[in-house]
């Protein structure tokens, strides 16, 4: 559920960038400039529902990963796919559906061992950063749902200020309508 919520937000951001037809950088083919990298910390630890969502998107195949190849320990398993499958949430259920229009390029790195979040960040920058050579990177934890244009605005901060080394967005609690009034700290 948390992973799907994050991915839905990321997919909507990619759609938004593709809708910016008057942009010199973005527009109809913007999806070709964006790669969604998912790094999961430990094959034994990955959430089964997350694995199912990744398999449904086409970027993961269960049963292929091995602990060793030719007697040597495997560090990570890397899957790559350009998906045209979308998702929607109905309660806590994830429903996959065909996407109309915007494909999403995905890389999924399933680390063999659980080595914590900082190691996953290092994997992302050292393994994929060198190959992809991105202009910017946006790191999101599973469960964080970006607004439909928030990744664009982060990119824009870097584009307008090329000497900028980092930027962060705002995180709001996701509460159902009227729940904010129950807790006076949240309501304030």
Curated annotation (Swiss-Prot):
Domain of life where this protein originates: Eukaryota
InterPro entries referenced in this protein's UniProt entry, alphabetically: Chitin_synth, Chitin_synth_fun
Protein's membrane topology: Multi-pass membrane protein
Pfam families: Chitin_synth_1 (PF01644)
Entry's Gene Ontology cellular component terms: cell septum; plasma membrane
GO molecular function: chitin synthase activity
Coiled-coil region(s): none
EC nos: 2.4.1.16
Keywords in alphabetical order: Cell membrane, Cell wall biogenesis/degradation, Glycosyltransferase, Membrane, Transferase, Transmembrane
Gene Ontology biological process terms, A to Z: cell wall organization; chitin biosynthetic process
Top EC class of this enzyme: transferase
Function: Polymerizes chitin, a structural polymer of the cell wall and septum, by transferring the sugar moiety of UDP-GlcNAc to the non-reducing end of the growing chitin polymer.
Protein family per UniProt: Belongs to the chitin synthase family. Class I subfamily.
Stated name of the protein: Chitin synthase 1
The gene coding this protein: CHS1
């Amino acid at each position: 559920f948390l992973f799907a919520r994050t991915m839905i937000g990321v997919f909507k951001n990619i759609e938004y960038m593709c809708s910016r037809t008057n942009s010199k950088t973005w527009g109809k083919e913007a999806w070709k400039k964006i790669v969604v990298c998912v790094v999961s910390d430990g094959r034994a630890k990955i959430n089964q529902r997350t694995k199912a969502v990744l398999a449904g998107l086409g970027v993961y195949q269960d049963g292929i990963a091995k602990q060793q190849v030719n007697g040597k320990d495997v560090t990570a398993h890397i899957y790559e796919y350009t998906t045209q499958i979308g998702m929607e949430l109905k309660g806590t259920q994830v429903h996959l559906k065909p996407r109309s229009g915007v494909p999403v390029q995905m890389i999924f790195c399933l680390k063999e061992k659980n080595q914590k979040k900082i190691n996953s960040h290092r994997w992302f920058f050292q393994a994929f950063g060198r190959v992809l050579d991105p202009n910017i990177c946006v790191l999101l934890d599973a469960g964080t749902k970006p607004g439909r244009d928030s990744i664009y605005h982060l990119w824009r901060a870097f584009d307008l200020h090329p000497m900028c080394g980092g930027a962060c967005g705002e995180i709001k609690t996701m509460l159902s309508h009227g729940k904010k009034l129950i807790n006076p700290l949240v309501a304030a």
